[in-house]
Amino acid sequence: MNQGETLGNVAKGVDLYSYRVPLGVCAGVAPFNFPAMCPLWMFPLSITLGNTYIMKPSEKVPGAMEVLLDLLKQSGVPDGVVNVVQGGKETVTDICTHPDIRAISFVGGN
């Protein structure tokens, strides 16, 4: 659906149009129990669609995201396309309230 597709008559009198429009800066907050899998659900699609990404890994296991950043660099992704911020609750609050972050993906519970 990220290719600008059109689906006619998805419901009575309803057509579906999708547009590939980058949002700008997006962010993700990952849980401690899936420190690589959840970020891999989040940032690849976002950067493929033309956005930059800020990833906040769990402060309990920050190393997995560092490995992913190294793999991104090796694959030729330019510096600054995916960024990592470390921290706890205050960092998440900052991400959620920052006016330049246009979309946020969360995985986790209370």
What residues fall within each predicted segment?
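Rossmann-like NAD(P) dinucleotide-binding subdomain of oxidoreductase/dehydrogenase enzymes
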Residues: 2-110
